[in-house]
Amino acid sequence: MGKTKLKSGKVGLKESEIQRQIIDWLELKENQGKLFFQRTNNIPVSQMRNGKRIFRSMAKGQKKGFPDILVLKAGRMIGLEVKTKTGKQSPFQKEIEKSFKKNGGEYYIVRSLEQVMFELDNPTCKHKKIKQK
């Protein structure tokens, strides 16, 4: 349970399992006063009506592709997009990543808790600044 078979035949964690590990660690750090985080949920809510699944549209101001987790740490704004080893960004996620970086934020595609721990404890400017027009 919580595993998915990769194309290579190896078994890897599902995105939800990776996210749960990350959130557990972030909660520990938040309780220690070391950061603030918010798990975002951009999936429109659905419900059954007359035997059909009906999806509510996203709330006003909510953006498709927003990172799964937003972290504030020591003046840094960090977007974490959780993916499996083979997961890829959607076009919406790529646009949000550009917006984060253009406006001074950090954005990481993370595939493990260890990667999150490294990125949060080793602030670097890996991304190139996008020149404003």
Predicted regions and their residues:
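Catalytic phosphate/metal-binding cores of nucleic-acid and nucleotide-processing enzymes, i.e., regions
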Residues: 1-133
